[in-house]
Amino acid sequence: MKAAIMRDAKIVVDEMATPVPSEHEVLVKTLACGICGSDLHALKHGHDMVQTSLETGGSFVMDLSKDIVMGHEFCAEVLDYGPNTNRTLKPGTRVCSFPTTVHNGTLATVGYSNLVPGGYSENMVLTESMLLPVPNGLPTAHAALTEPMAVGLHAVRMARLNKTEVPLVIGCGPVGLAVIAALKQTGIGPIIAVDYSAKRRELAELMGADEIIDPNNTSPYESWKNIAKYDDNGKLMPVE
C-alpha cells in the first residue's frame, strides 16, 4: 500500500506492507484524514515532543530513526477482521475511532507509533472496541473531524462553566472552533472569540461566537472584562 511516511524529518510517499489485523483488530481503508497541528510539531520538533513526553509520563514513545505514518483525525471503511473479534460492523461500514489501539498487547497512539500506521496510509489496523460507526449519512470529510471536535467538547465539559460565566476563546483554529461549537451547543454565552486571522474570526462567527476580537486593535482581556462585567477586583457582576 502507499503511505505518506515521516522519514528523516520529511514526508515522503512510499510503498509499505499492508498491515495484517491481529487479535481484536480490524483492517480498515482510509477514506479521509485531517492534518493536525501536532503532526506539524512532530515533523519539525519530534525529538522535543518525545523527550517532553518521557519526562511527563506521556505516550509519545516513537522512535524517530524509524518510519512513522501519522494521521489520527480520520474516517475509514471496515475491510476485514482479525481473530477473536465480534464482527459487529459489516465490511463497508464507515467508522471513526479513538486514536489509540492495542496492538499485540501493546498500547499505541495512532499516528505517533512505530507499531501501526496512521491515517496517512491507504490502510490501517484499529482495535475493534474503539470503533465508532459514522451515523446518519454524515459526509466522510465531516466525520474525519470527529477527533478534534471531541477535543473541543471535552475542554468545555472540563471547564464546567455555568450560565453566569462568559467564555473567552483565544485562538480560533480547528480546536478553538470546536470549543465555540460546543459552547454554543450547551447554551453558554456570550462567547468571545479572539484571533489575529481575519479568516478565522469569520469562521468563529459562523460557528456561533457572539463577540469577535482582533487583538491587533483591541485587548481581548479588557473586552472580556467589560462584556462579562467583572469589576476591577475581579468579582463577577450579574450579566443582564
Could you tell me what each predicted segment is?
Residues 3, 13-15, 75-77, 94, ...:
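Conserved hydrophobic/aromatic beta-strand scaffold that supports enzyme active sites
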Residues 19-33, 48-101, 135-137:
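Glycine-rich beta-strand-centered segment in the early N-terminal region that forms part
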Residues 60-67, 72, 97-170:
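NAD(P)H dinucleotide-binding glycine-rich loop of Rossmann-like/cofactor-binding domains
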Residues 169-172, 184-240:
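Adenosine-nucleotide cofactor-binding segment
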Residues 176-177:
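N-terminal Rossmann-fold NAD(P) dinucleotide-binding loop
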